[in-house]
């Protein structure tokens, strides 16, 4: 996997109401207001920006992360699929749709441990590796072990992992998001927490495209114009 280069997300101007009088805040770091106010949520998933309960930049990123999941990601791509569909193997080198769903949960879990718990990449405990290495690495191990589950099984795991991510984001500020990891093992040099989590977001887009292709190749699948 290659981490994508990202530029720092620009802050959004926020409006804070004091005693019924609206005061427009300047765009900027806004260190005096490290957590977005309850009125910061825009009306609708398709309006990206700060979110209540998060620092400004983290909230803006959370809106992107949730848009990917809720509007255009793995949930919509797998809607209505049966267990047989999720277990279908296109060829001997392919991954099943179910395995790709669990792969997204595994990836997010490993980034949680690295960025929230400060665990060096690939130094997880044996217990964690037994649980997550097969869906993380996929290949033969994934093909052999990830099967026999309905869609709810995978969706519930994705939801559980995401809820932990959001809870941890609420505990952190924009300075944490921009913290640089000089010892990052791949991607050509240092990175920061923002880039790591941007990868988690775009990683779902990448595999959602694979899932869409696999869905079109399912036995009995109807032709699609997309």
Go through the PLM ranges and name each one.
Residues 1-12:
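N-terminal secretory signal peptides
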Residues 61, 69, 73, 99, ...:
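Extracytoplasmic/secreted proteins, especially bacterial periplasmic and envelope-associated proteins
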């Amino acid at each position: 996997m290659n981490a994508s280069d990202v530029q720092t997300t620009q802050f959004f101007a926020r409006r804070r109401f004091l005693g019924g009088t609206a005061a427009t805040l300047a765009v900027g770091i806004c260190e005096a207001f490290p957590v977005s106010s309850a009125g910061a949520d825009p009306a609708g998933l398709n309006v990206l920006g700060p979110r209540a309960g998060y620092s400004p930049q983290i909230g803006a990123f959370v809106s992107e992360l949730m848009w990917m999941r809720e509007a255009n990601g793995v949930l919509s791509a797998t809607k209505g699929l049966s267990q047989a569909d999720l277990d279908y193997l296109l060829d001997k080198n392919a991954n099943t749709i179910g395995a790709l769903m669990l792969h997204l949960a595994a990836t997010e879990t490993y980034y949680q441990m690295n960025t929230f718990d400060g665990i060096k990449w690939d130094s997880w405990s044996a217990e964690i590796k037994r649980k997550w290495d097969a869906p993380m690495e996929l290949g033969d191990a994934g093909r052999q072990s990830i099967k026999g589950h309905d869609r709810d099984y995978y969706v519930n795991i994705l939801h559980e992992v995401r809820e932990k991510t959001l809870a941890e984001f609420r505990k952190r500020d924009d300075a944490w998001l921009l913290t640089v990891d000089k010892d990052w093992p791949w991607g050509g040099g240092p990175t920061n927490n923002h880039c790591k989590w941007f990868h988690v977001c775009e990683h779902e887009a990448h595999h959602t495209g694979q899932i869409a292709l696999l869905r079109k190749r399912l036995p009995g699948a109807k032709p699609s114009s997309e």
